[in-house]
From Swiss-Prot:
The gene is htpX. It comes from Aliivibrio fischeri (strain ATCC 700601 / ES114). Its cofactor is Zn(2+). The chain crosses the membrane at residues 4-24, 36-56, 151-171, 199-219. Belongs to the peptidase M48B family. One of its GO terms (cellular component) is plasma membrane. This is Protease HtpX. Keywords: Cell inner membrane, Cell membrane, Hydrolase, Membrane, Metal-binding, Metalloprotease, Protease, Transmembrane, Transmembrane helix, Zinc.
Amino acid sequence: MKRIALFLATNLAVMIVFSIVLNIVYAVTGIQQGSLSGLLVMAVLFGFGGSLISLMMSKSMALRSVGGEVIEQPRNETEHWLLETVSRQAQQVGIGMPTVAIYDSPDMNAFATGAKRDDSLVAVSTGLLHSMTRDEAEAVLAHEVSHIANGDMITMTLMQGVVNTFVIFLSRMIANAVSGFTSSDEEGEGEGGSFMTYFIVSTVLELAFGFLASFLTMWFSRHREFHADAGAAQLVGKQKMIAALERLRMGQESQLEGSMMAFGINGKKSLTELLMSHPPLEKRIDALRQM
């Protein structure tokens, strides 16, 4: 789950920077006023650019954000068990051995991230290692390995790129129309006023459309959680996965943020399930029992 939260946060930051750059390009070239095709090309480049940069940076940013320590050589029995378990599961699903890290946090969580199936990261909290049995922790690791095997981060990147492109294109197309309408009605405003109108309208619309698009992003995240749970059940047995989710119900809410949250084992609560990156634990447990 930590991995989705970080991905979305990074993507948002990149999108804000790209939005400012796009507005500067508009002010200098005026390409958006006369060419919808030019706007579409820029929307695709900048929309997918933000997602791809987020994906490429996800592994290093995730480690830095949680202060994770990569296990190079196991120093104790727990670290040895972690490496052996992840290695075995990675071989079972046919992916390269992920980098394994531990980060200090009281909440029971873990996350996976990385741009490629054969160059990924699995990080586990100290809270999870201290609070879960080995069987439960094994199920959590299987859940994260399943995320990697399913290529969820790649799919999320492609989907986010499409969403970003739509948000950029539609917000600027509407902003063009509004700025053109207001500048013709207020001739004394001049080019500076027209650009300010465009900048304000496009920024507000990007934020609004981006918020609405998050419903789609969160739906995808919830959908993939069920698949990762099912993948873990195939690797270690559904009873272990159910036991791990039952244990999570006793713990505190996840402290993971950004893209990391979406690909962690547990998510944050929200006023509405539509804005949750993870389905309620009860629904996940019921789905496993029905397998």
